[in-house]
Structure formats: structure tokens, C-alpha cells
Curated annotation (Swiss-Prot):
Keywords: Phosphoprotein. The lineage of its organism: Eukaryota, Metazoa, Chordata, Craniata, Vertebrata. This is Aspartate dehydrogenase domain-containing protein. One of its GO terms (molecular function) is aspartate dehydrogenase activity. It comes from Mus musculus. PANTHER family: ASPARTATE DEHYDROGENASE DOMAIN-CONTAINING PROTEIN, L-ASPARTATE DEHYDROGENASE-RELATED.
Amino acid sequence: MATSTLPQVPYKVGVVGYGRLGQSLVSRLLAQGSELGLELVFVWNRDPGRMAGSVPPALQLQDLTALEERHPDLVVEVAHPKIIHESGAQILRHANLLVGSPSALADQTTEQQLLEASKRWGHTVFVARGALWGSEDISRLDAAGGLQSLRVTMATHPDGFRLEGPLAAAHSSGPRTVLYEGPVRGLCPLAPRNSNTMAAAALAAPSLGFDRVIGVLVADLSLTDMHVVDVELLGPPGPSGRSFAVHTHRENPAQPGAVTGSATVTAFWHSLLGCCQLTSRPGIHLC
């Protein structure tokens, strides 16, 4: 259950990943943490040199397996799905986990490992909503048994993609090219850093999940400074037979070639604050 204020005793937070999103979170925690009842206890990055000159040496964690020594209450992952695959279950032994790369959960083995660790140690797997607009409404409709279909399209300039496998060799055939259209589970390993919005949608709608939520990835040469996310869902039919429908269109400003849009950074900060106000409970929960 949420409390009305952040904890009076400093709530200890560790950050895993020091890219654009990690840098923003660390900066805010250092500047505002004390007044919010939060204490940054470590920052880890695969390349430690990236932290030099900006993260106080005492906060730099060289070995992620030693995070227990910092006694975190919450570990925030903003690095890469590989961190969740490799270390997510171990992190849950010591702290709650805020997953910034939910595409990792498309791997069923990883999802099961996190669920088992969460139940064993009594810690929560939080998943940041990120760029997904309307996640609570999606969850409510799904819980009521009314969600019939869910489709998430993410479009941006090709320079904003970090693709793997067969998609890495994909080329735009015109000003707007559909690179992938199909189940989110199939997209996540091919575009692990560009499918997090779709993954969050799959988690918001467990009746459909990763296999029935449809993800569409579009390369659009005109979108040099933004990410565009369209969420389309169908609900139950009305008396006339016409189905309930929602379509949201979100334009998120972004630096050219950036993976993370500007509004997503702010949304993630609020997800972090929200996690700190919730009591630990086993399972995977959007935040």
C-alpha cells in the first residue's frame, strides 16, 4: 500500500548503468535525494571510466556482486537487458529491483527466475512504465476481462535504433519502413533497447502477454528529433456490436540518434519515486 510521504529513514538506492538515463537519475539523487528521504549508495557501470569526474569515488561500485556491502533498499537497472538476465535474481536477494529494461522479461527463463527470487527473498520486481501511456487503464481493462487486443507501434529515425540479429542488417526501403510486426516476445531479443515500451504493455496486459501483444517497429527518416509511440487497443463489443477502442499517439522529443526520449527520463524519475513509497511484495509490478 502506498504511503503519503517518502520514508523518514533514508531509503538507500543503487543505480546500475550510467548512460543518459543513469546520469540523469544519479544527478537528481545527488541534488534532491536528502530532501526526499533518499540516499544514493552506489553507481555501477560496465565501463567504470565513464563515471570518472562525475560520480564521487566513494559511490563508484567496481564489482556488482559486492552490492550487498552497500545495503541498498532499491537497485535501479538502467543499463541493458543483459544485466537482468545475468544478475537480476541475485540483486533480489538483497533489495527491491526497478527494471528499466523490461524487454529482458520476454525471456521466459529470466521472468521465472525473477519471480522465484522475489518470492524467496520477499523483494519486489518493479517495472518502469517508461514511454507507455495509459498503462493503468490497460491493466484495469485487462483485469476486468475486457481487453481483446493490444498493439504498440514505435517509430523513430533509423539512427535511434540499436538492433541485433536479423534486424541489425535491416535497411530502410523508403522514407518509412516497417522493420518488425508481430508478437512482442519475438521483437525483444532483436531490439532489446527499443522494445521496452512494448514489453511494458505486455506486462500491463497479462491475459495477452508477450505472445499476444503486437509490437511494430518503424524506421521513419522524417523523425530526426522524436520518438512516436502509438498504442491501439480494442475492448468488449457494445450493444450494436461495435467494440470499445482507444488509440493514443505520443510524440516524445529526443536528441538525434538517442535511444531514450526526453519525457521518458522524467517518467522514469517518477517511477523511481513511486517505488520508494511502496511496501515490498513478491511479484512483478508496473510502477
